[in-house]
Amino acid sequence: MKQVFQDARNAEITVEEVPAPKLLAGCVFVRTAASLVSAGTERASSEFAGKSLLQKARMRPDLVRDVLNKISRDGLMAAASAVRSRLDQPSALGYSSAGIVITVGEGITDINVGDRVACAGAGHAVHAEFACVPRLLVAKVPSESVSFDEAAFTTLGAVALHGVRNADAKLGDVVAVIGLGLLGQLTVQILKAAGCCVLGMDISSERADLALHLGADAVSTSASGFRDLCLQRSAGHGVDSVLIAAQSASNDPVNLAGAVARNRAVVVAVGTVAMDIPRRTFYEKELDFRVSRSYGPGRYDAAYEQKGIDYPIGYVRWTETRNMEAFLKLLADRKLDLQPLITHRFPITRARSAYDLITGKTPEPFLGVLVSYPQNASEDRHIRLSTDRRITAHQSVRIGLLGAGGFATRTLLPAMKRVRGIEMIVAGAATGAHARYAAQKFGFRSCTTDEKEVFSNPEVNTVVIATRHHLHAGQVISALRSGQHVFCEKPLCLNEAELKEIVAAHRDATSALLMVGFNRRFAPLAIRMKDFVHAAREPLAIHYRVNAGFIPADHWLHDPLQGGGRIVGEVCHFVDFLCFLTGSSPAEVETRSLPNPGWYSNDNVVCTLRFRDGSLGTISYLANGDGGFSKERIEVFGGGKIAVLDDFRRLELHGGGKNNIFRSRFTQDKGHRGEWEALVTAIQAGAESPINFDEIVNTMLATFALDESRCLGQPVRVRERELFNSDTPSATAGIDRAS
């Protein structure tokens, strides 16, 4: 399918051929008929992308702080690599579209194939021939009388409608609308449908005249004239509410809003404007200033938008979905007239012309700009980018990738590209945009949104799994059953039931190896550290401090069904590293948590592990620290020796009266390249996994036990991997509570 992208470096607009998106549970698959180009949001995005790095830094000091923190924590080269990766990845544009439902995902019961729908959401309702959209970002078009062109306005219409609701506009109110662009014109019509007296202001006489034509009671093109108009139409009191629908870096719209408002009026910022509130005016009038958030309650709530958990209507009357439905109902009842707002239509092949228009490269008046789509577009989920095999003497490990998110494209794939003997065959991701980006940047021959294309591809002998955690187990099993080697990013799975299935699949796949991305054990300084302490030949005491950093409670990693929580999803890394250093496996574990004040997610924990060789380890995994401080520090004591590894950049070795310091050259090295060099060597030699499969199972069993201990508040014994492999019917056979 064709999709519109923007280059983050220079704002160039391109139309690319990408695989159609994968249909996900709780989503609908839509053939797009029309989409709306937002003259506000998308123009601002294009203008920002077109600025120099220095200009971007001045506009987004928050991003500069993030980069500086990364430099102090990970080093200059790692930070530069992360910035380049972010800039290299093109942005998918668009957030308001309409079309016909082609397929519905699991769990969808109220949307049917063939339904005409409006779609919303950045990353979902994009400018593309097909879209996969979560259910609560979809609204049925209620009547055939509403065209696809009109329905494509629904997202922006919901933004305007939510602004009106925030203004508490009532029948008979006098309401001012500042800014009569597309958002302002929709706001004017919605207010008139609600029975308000509407006064509009825009410096463009053409837009002011259009607002009059669409129902505004009076308009003005100057600030002084608008102040007089508002006093005249409100019996000298000032207006009851003001909606700022302008896009401006100036504070003039907010100043004007304060000037025309009556005492205790409501001022709502719907557009993007400067908000340096004039205190004296707003204080003396006791004005209520509100910022209207997008298209209503539910926006930016992953539980609502991604999981489809609706808010009860008795508690939240107007969610974003219900705002979309209300706007469509106004269209069906002919309370709104959108035809005068549509000034341009472009086929998707000419999308660049649409952006030239809204960014001013084409000097021509515009308002509503639509993108149209052919109705015979291909739904192919697999795109071939090249046909030459480029076989080298070192070609052996032929990669099929599943998952092309931030970690894969910024860390994993760059490390793989530096290892000889790897050939990139097919890149798979849930969206065509991510799949194509990974394929083009890292030299894959083709890209797909259908994971079956990876498992069935005869050229792929090694599957790399870098998807979200809840998908790992099923994909690992599918690859093993296809006879393919597997590299799975951590965690291997989310629970013991999944682990038992993987153990069985691995037992049956006699010719395939399985490796998990426990990369830290392959870091050069980690190997030097182990060699040093291993000579002690006695149990070790290890303290591993992880300054993990805060992530919001609604982040997918905290979701037990999708991310598994931070203990399962991340602490497994550090459990493996302790197993690596001791050469043993945990026998008993205990997890204690700090009291949760409400904004953390049980991710401030201290884990204690007693190993079968007598070693003791503690992992302090903390989300309550300063993100600018170093992330990881490991201290090992044993046999009269001490080893300290600081953030995989500096290693201190103390023993026998000697003190030695080693540093990682140029940048932090956490072993990502090393793990792939070891894996390629193993595959080429027909050897077992660089991390023994029993060790992987033991690490996951210990991790599950740590999570269990956190819930129980008591120590938990971890059975040996051999016992777990027995044919016990229990799904939790690997864990024993300690008495």
Each PLM stretch: what is its role?
Residues V4, G236, S241-L243, V268-G271, ...:
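C-terminal capping/lid region of NAD(P)-dependent oxidoreductase domains
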Residues P21-V37, S45-G123, E144, Q684:
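Glycine-rich beta-strand-centered segment in the early N-terminal region that forms part
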Residues G123-H124, D149-S224:
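Mid-domain Rossmann-like dinucleotide-binding core that forms the NAD(H)/NADP(H) cofactor-binding site
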Residues R262-N263, T462, A473-F518:
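Beta-strand-loop-alpha-helix segment that lines the small-molecule cofactor/substrate pocket
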Residues V270-D288, S292, G298, L492-L513:
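Rossmann-fold NAD(P)-binding glycine/threonine-rich loop
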Residues L287, G298-Y315, A512-L513, N519-G598, ...:
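Predominantly a Rossmann-like dinucleotide-binding segment in NAD(P)-dependent oxidoreductases
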Residues S353-D356, G360-R384, G569, V575-R650, ...:
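Contiguous beta-strand/loop segments that form the cofactor/metal-binding neighborhood of enzyme cores
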Residues E379-F442:
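N-terminal Rossmann-like dinucleotide-binding module
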